[in-house]
Each structure stands twice: as C-alpha cells, then as structure tokens.
C-alpha cells in the first residue's frame, strides 16, 4: 500500500477499477440495510471495509502470479468504487427503490423467472467481446473443431476431425440480416418468456434493441475508437434490428410457453447462421486487440460468456416451454 504509485496508467484502468467494484458496494449496502435498517452508518462502513479487504486480498494474490503485479492504485480505486456503490445502495434504500422493484416483479414477472432474468442481465456482457456478425454470440464451432483436432493429434483418431478452414466465403447480406434478426428476436422472446402478458411487454422489445445497440456501439468504440462506434451497423444489420423489433411487438401478446418455444427456434437458427460466419481480417484484428492489448484482463470472461450465453438461454427456454402452466 505504501509503495510508490505506478508510473504508467490509463483512464480505462481508472474507470474500470472503480466501476468494477461499484455493484459490490450496492449489493452489500442493500443486503445489510435490509437486515439491519437501524445501523445504517456502521453497516455502510462495514460494507466499504469488506470491499477494501477483498481488493487487498486479490491484489496481494497477484504477487504470486508470474504475469501480474499488485497495484496500490487499483486497491484505492476498488475501495472508492465500493464506497460509491454503498452510497448508491443507501440512496436506493432511502427512496424505497427495492419496494418498488418488488411490486414490479410481482406484477410483471412469472414465477421461477430467476434464471431468465440472470441471463438477460448477462446478455450485454456477451456482446462486449467482438463477434463476426453483429449480435452473433455463440460462435464456437471453429474453436471447438480446432480444440478437438488438437486433442486427437497423434492418436488413431487424428483424421476424424480436421482443423477449421480459415478461408470462408463472405457471409453475405441476407445471412447477416437473418443472423441479426433471429438473434435479437430470440432475446426478445426470452424476455417475454419470463414476463406476464400486458402492456409492459411493449416496452421490453425497444429496451432489448436499445441495450443491444448501445453495448455493440460501446464494444466498437473501445476497440476501434469513438469515431467507429457505429461501424458495425451495416444496412443488413439495421434491417435485421427493425424486423426483430417489429416481430417482437406483434407477438407481445403470446403466452410465456409459446414465446419460449419461438425463442428456442430463433436461437437455433441464429447459431446455425452465426457459426457459418467467416473470421474476416477486421474480426481477426479486433480479437488481437482484445486478447493481446489493454483488454487482456477482460477478454477471457467476456469471451466465455459470449460463447456459452445462447446455449444457457436455450436450456432455460426449453425448460419454460416444457413446463406446465
């Protein structure tokens, strides 16, 4: 802690280290205040201390890793992020935000909607890691094929699985349109599968589109720069977004089970198209920036979320479609 401050740092490191611990502070504050509402200041101080202790332990453990170095400025920023989150959580408690959310949950959500809500909350993270086509999460076939071929190399089964061919024909506007339409429509159906029928569903589809566009723009901006934030929005992608939103609004009256069934079909179609997408030079450069550049701390988590998210969503929707009313 008393070591000199690091000579080299970036604003990305400052913001990410502070924001990364903000949700922890919010959750700790809300949990403590819900259990012991009369000891607010003591609980808030305890929450900040717990966040600081967690950061201190994790920074200390980095000293045992060959490629990592502990940083006192990271510890300070993590602690400040926790403190900011505690203040936000205290404000939410004072304003009765939790009570309002509980009433909205009862009015909007179906029973046992927890897994679907978690997946909807994680979906923006899956879009952060570069994809070969907009909203094209679940692009795992090439990696899986290469991994299996590498594992079988030198065995009697070496010829059964060949490494993926890096040369592909361009995906084409029609397939890109189909990939975007089915991917976004499937997320809308996941949202419908966990909510009750009503006017609020008419808000969910625009919210899904707005969040998806915003996170995709953020991913492009932090990869290529702010001037290229909307470079991913090709005419095919734009038309796909319009069609996905329009179809979702037309089907907002569907029962949850039927929405889950349609979403399951849409996810299957999206995965089939996305895994045909080529790894063009721009996509390869984006991967290199994330895997070897300043986002190296985050690429592993976001990559795995992007790979596995649609399959987890399909499992949840399969359970919803098969459940009894």
Residue map of PLM features:
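Bulky hydrophobic segments
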Residues: 1-67, 72, 83-325
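Long, hydrophobic, well-ordered secondary-structure blocks that form the structural core
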Residues: 76-79
């Amino acid at each position: 802690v008393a070591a000199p401050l690091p000579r080299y740092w970036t604003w990305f490191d400052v913001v990410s280290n502070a924001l990364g611990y903000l949700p922890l502070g919010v959750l700790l504050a809300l949990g403590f205040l819900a259990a012991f509402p009369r000891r607010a200041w003591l609980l808030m101080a305890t929450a900040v201390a717990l966040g600081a202790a967690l950061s201190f332990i994790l920074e200390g453990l980095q000293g045992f890793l060959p490629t990592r170095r502990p940083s006192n400025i990271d510890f300070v920023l993590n602690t400040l992020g926790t403190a900011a989150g505690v203040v936000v959580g205290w404000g939410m408690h004072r304003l009765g935000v939790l009570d309002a959310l509980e009433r909205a949950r009862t009015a909007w959500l179906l029973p046992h909607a927890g897994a679907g809500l978690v997946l909807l909350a994680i979906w923006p993270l899956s879009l952060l890691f570069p994809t070969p086509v907009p909203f094209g999460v679940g692009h795992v076939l090439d990696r899986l094929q290469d991994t299996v071929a590498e594992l079988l190399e030198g065995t009697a089964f070496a010829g059964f699985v060949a490494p993926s061919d890096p040369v592909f024909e361009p995906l084409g506007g029609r397939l890109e349109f189909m990939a975007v339409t089915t991917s976004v429509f499937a997320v809308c159906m996941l949202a419908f599968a966990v909510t009750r029928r009503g006017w609020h569903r008419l808000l969910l589809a625009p919210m899904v589109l707005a969040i998806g566009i915003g996170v995709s723009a953020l991913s492009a901006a932090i990869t290529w720069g702010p001037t290229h934030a909307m470079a991913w929005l090709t005419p095919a992608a734009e038309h796909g977004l319009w069609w996905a939103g329009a179809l979702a609004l037309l089907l907002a009256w569907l029962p949850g089970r039927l929405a889950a069934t349609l979403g399951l079909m849409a996810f299957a179609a999206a995965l089939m198209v996305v895994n045909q997408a080529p790894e063009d030079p721009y996509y390869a450069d984006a991967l290199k920036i994330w895997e070897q550049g300043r986002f190296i701390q985050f690429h592993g988590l976001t990559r795995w979320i992007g790979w596995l998210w649609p399959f987890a969503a399909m499992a949840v929707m399969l359970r919803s479609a098969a459940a009894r009313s």
